[in-house]
Amino acid sequence: MSSASVTAFEKEHLWMYLQALGFEPGPATIACGKIVSHTHLGVNMFDKLNRDAFHIISYFLFQVLDQSLTKEVFKFCWPPFDQKSDTEFRKHCCEWIKRISGECGSSFPQVVGSLFLSPGGPKFIHLMYHFARFVAMKYIKSNSKNSSHHFVETFNIKPQDLHKCIARCHFARSRFLQILQRQDCVTQKYQENAQLSVKQVRNLRSECIGLENQIKKMEPYDDHSNMEEKIQKVRSLWASVNETLMFLEKEREVVSSVLSLVNQYALDGTNVAINIPRLLLDKIEKQMFQLHIGNVYEAGKLNLLTVIQLLNEVLKVMKYERCQADQARLTVDLHYLEKETKFQKERLSDLKHMRYRIKDDLTTIRHSVVEKQGEWHKKWKEFLGLSPFSLIKGWTPSVDLLPPMSPLSFDPASEEVYAKSILCQYPASLPDAHKQHNQENGCRGDSDTLGALHDLANSPASFLSQSVSSSDRNSVTVLEKDTKMGTPKEKNEAISKKIPEFEVENSPLSDVAKNTESSAFGGSLPAKKSDPFQKEQDHLVEEVARAVLSDSPQLSEGKEIKLEELIDSLGSNPFLTRNQIPRTPENLITEIRSSWRKAIEMEENRTKEPIQMDAEHREVLPESLPVLHNQREFSMADFLLETTVSDFGQSHLTEEKVISDCECVPQKHVLTSHIDEPPTQNQSDLLNKKVICKQDLECLAFTKLSETSRMETFSPAVGNRIDVMGGSEEEFMKILDHLEVSCNKPSTNKTMLWNSFQISSGISSKSFKDNDFGILHETLPEEVGHLSFNSSSSSEANFKLEPNSPMHGGTLLEDVVGGRQTTPESDFNLQALRSRYEALKKSLSKKREESYLSNSQTPERHKPELSPTPQNVQTDDTLNFLDTCDLHTEHIKPSLRTSIGERKRSLSPLIKFSPVEQRLRTTIACSLGELPNLKEEDILNKSLDAKEPPSDLTR
C-alpha cells in the first residue's frame, strides 16, 4: 500500500475521530481566541503547516482525555498568543504525548519534539491519527456501557491478516453508519419541528401586532375639552333617576309588600329565634374558656358573629359524627330487602282480600242486626205493650240515645263541642257528705229512743266471732250503716203513708209523728216545690197500700172503691201521658188471693211434719231448696207479725214505723244521693256490713223461734218457719256461699224495676236475704235515667214467677193481716213450740264451731267481696241489689226454662215484699243463749189483748 493512500486514510479517519468525539470547529476556534474565518479546519488541514489547527485540535483531544488535568497543565499557556506561550504549549504537548506513547508501546509512533515545531506533513498526520485513535478508545472505554475489553483490544492489535482487517473495518463502518443515519433522522425531524415552531411564532407575533393595532384604534381619544360636558350630562341623568325613585317610593313599598320582598335580605336578626340543641349547648359549656363565644342576643338583637361560631361548632360535631359513622358503614342486604318486599306484598294482598271478605260479611251482619232488633222490639211490645225506648224518649233529654260517635281522636275537644255535649247540659250534682251525715245522725237519734220493740222482734244469735260484750256496739254499727238511705223528710212521708187510716184517726200516733217531724227536721230542709202529679200519685199509692195491708171497715164506709180501680188509676192519671206502662196487672187481687191461700194450705201441711236433720240434705245443694221456700214464707210471716204488732201501742207503733219506713218506703231523692255517693267508702264498714248480714241470715231461725214463743197466735206461718229452719241450718251455710258467688256474677237475664235503685239505697247490697218487694214499693219513678238496659231474651224472669216458685210457700197477706174477718184453723201449741225451741237451741249450739270454720275459711273467690276497691263500691251497692232479688230465681229453680204462659200465671213481682230485710237491717244482735225479756212479752200480750178480740187471737 503506497504512502499516499495511507496518508489519505489517516487524514480521513482523523477527522472522523474528531467528529465522533464531538468536535465543533466554530466554538473550538472561538474558545482558542482565533478568528473563525482565518482558521482552516477539515480533512486536509495538516497538508501544510497549520499552527492554529494544531493548537485547537491538540487542546480538544487533551480536554476529552482529562479535562481537569488539561486545565492544570495548560493553565499559563492557553491560549497561546505569543511566542513564549506557544513554546510552552508545544513543550507540554510533547511531554504528554510521550507518556501516552510509553503506555501504548510499539503500536504508538515515536514522538519527536521537532514535529511540533512545524505541525504539518505525513509524519505529523500519522502522529495525530494515533493520538486521536487513543483518545477515542479511552472515551469508548469510559463512556460506553456495553463496551468489552475484547472490543477495545482490537484497536491495539496490529492486523496480521489483511482480509480480517478489511472485514472488521466494513463491519464497524456499517454499524457506525447506522448510528449516523439514526442521528441524522432525529436531526432532520428536529429541524422540521423547529421550522414549524418558528412559523407559528411568527404568525402569533403578527396576530399580536394586529390586535395591538386594533386596541390602539379602539382607545378613546383624550379630548379634555368634552370631558366636563360629559360629567355634567351624567350628573343630570342621575338626578332624574333619583327624582323618579322618590316619586315611586310608596308604590314600590306596596308592590314589595304584596310580593313579600320587604326585608328579604335583612340580617339584623330581629325576628329570628334561635334554638340551640342540648348537645351543642353542653359541648359549648364544656369548652367555654377555649372557644370564647359571646351571647347570641346582645341588646335585643342577634349577634351574627356568635351565630357563625355556633354554626362552625355544629359543622365540627357533624364531621366528628360522620367520621364515627363511616367506620362501620351500612351494608345493603339486597336479598333481605327482596325477601321483605315479597313478604309485604303478600301481606298487602291478604289484607285486601280480607277487606273484601269483611265488606261481604258486613252486609250479612247488618241484616242480622236489623232482624234481631226487630225481634227485640216485637218481644218488648208483647210483654209491655209498647217499645221500651218510648219510655225514655221525651221524658228526660239527658238519658236520650246519643248520636253516633265521631271518629276517635286524641286531640282535646274544643269548648264549643263540650258546651253542646250531654255532660255539660246535664251536669252531675255531688251532695255534701257532711250534710248528709248530719241528717242521718239526726234520723238515727230519733230511732234510737224507739228500739225496745225491735229488740224483741229482731234478736238473732251471732254465729260469727262476736262476744256478748260487743253485741251492742255491733248492732249500733248495723243501724248506722243501714239507715243511710234517705232524707228525714222522706222518712216522715213513709210514716204517714204506711200507718193505716184507722190507726191514724184513733190513736195519737199521727200527732207524735208530726211533732217529731216538725221538731227534728222542720228547719233543716228547704221547701220542696209542690207537684200536683206527684201528690196525686202519692195519694193513689197510699190508697193501694192501705187496701193491701188491712181490710178495715173504715175503708168501705162511704168509699166503695175497688183495688183494681185504684191500681188502674195509676196508669190513667189525668196528669200523666201514656209514655209509661201500667206497673200493676189487672188481675192483681185474684193472683194475690189464689197464691196466698195455696201458700196457707201448704203451711198448715208442713207444720205437722217433724224436725228432720238429714245429712244428705245438708250436703247437696238442690236438697236445700225448701229452706229458701220457707225463707220467703218466713218473710211473709214476719210482715204479718209486724203489721199486727203495730196495733199494740203508740210508742211501739211509732218505733216500728220509723225504723221500717226508713228501709222500705220508696223515696224520691234516694236515687240521686246513692249515685252521687263518693266512691271512697270505708272498706271496714263494708266488711262489717257483710259479716253482720251473714250473721242475720244464719241466725234467722233462732230469732223467729223466739218470736213464735211469744206471738204464736198471730200467724201459723211462724211455726212452720221454725220447723224448717231448725232442720236446715247447715244448708243455709252452703246456700250462703252460693249466693255470695252469684252476687258477684253479672246476670244478663235481669231487668231492673222502676224503683230498684230507690230501694237499693235502703237495702244492703251485700245482704243475702229475700229481697222481694210489696205494693208499697211500687211507684212511678222521677228519674227515668237510671233504668237498666241490661235486659236480654230472658229479661222477663223478674216480672213473672213460676208456679213452683218460693212464693207458693208464702202466707196470704190479706187473710192474715185481716184476720178479724176470716178464721183459719190453728194446730199450734205453746208447749210444743217451746220443746221445739229447746231442741233447736241444742242443735244450733253443736253446730256453732262448724259455723265459725265455715265463715272464717272464705274461698278465694269470696275474698274480693270482703275488701272491695273504692271504684267498685258504688257499683256493688247499686247492682248487687238486683242480683240478690233474683238469687232464688237463678240458683234454686229453673225459672228461665219455664214457658211464657206459666210466667204470666204466676204472682207479679209488684206484691213481693220481705220485711225480713227491715228486721235484719235494724237488728241488735244478742248472744245465742239469751232469751227474750218476759216483761216485754207481757207488754206485747197486754197490748194484744187490748187491741184484738179473742176470736182473732185463736186463729
Swiss-Prot record:
The modification Phosphothreonine is found at T584, T823. Residues 474-495, 789-814, 848-876 are annotated as: Disordered. Residues 188-219 form a coiled coil. The modification Phosphoserine is found at S406, S507, S524, S530, S550, S552, S715, S728, S742, S805, S908, S914, S943. One of its GO terms (biological process) is cell division. Keywords: Cell cycle, Cell division, Coiled coil, Cytoplasm, Cytoskeleton, Microtubule, Mitosis, Phosphoprotein. Phosphorylated during mitosis. It is found in: Cytoplasm, Cytoskeleton; Cytoplasm, Cytoskeleton, Spindle; Cytoplasm, Cytoskeleton, Microtubule organizing center, Centrosome. Its main location: cytoplasm. InterPro entries: HAUS_6 (IPR026797), HAUS_6_N (IPR028163). Residues 479-495 have a biased composition (Basic and acidic residues). GO terms for molecular function: microtubule binding. One of its GO terms (cellular component) is cytosol. Pfam families: HAUS6_N (PF14661). Component of the HAUS augmin-like complex. The complex interacts with the gamma-tubulin ring complex and this interaction is required for spindle assembly. Interacts with PLK1, NEDD1 and gamma-tubulin. Interacts with EML3 (phosphorylated at 'Thr-881'). Contributes to mitotic spindle assembly, maintenance of centrosome integrity and completion of cytokinesis as part of the HAUS augmin-like complex. Promotes the nucleation of microtubules from the spindle through recruitment of NEDD1 and gamma-tubulin. Belongs to the HAUS6 family. This is HAUS augmin-like complex subunit 6.
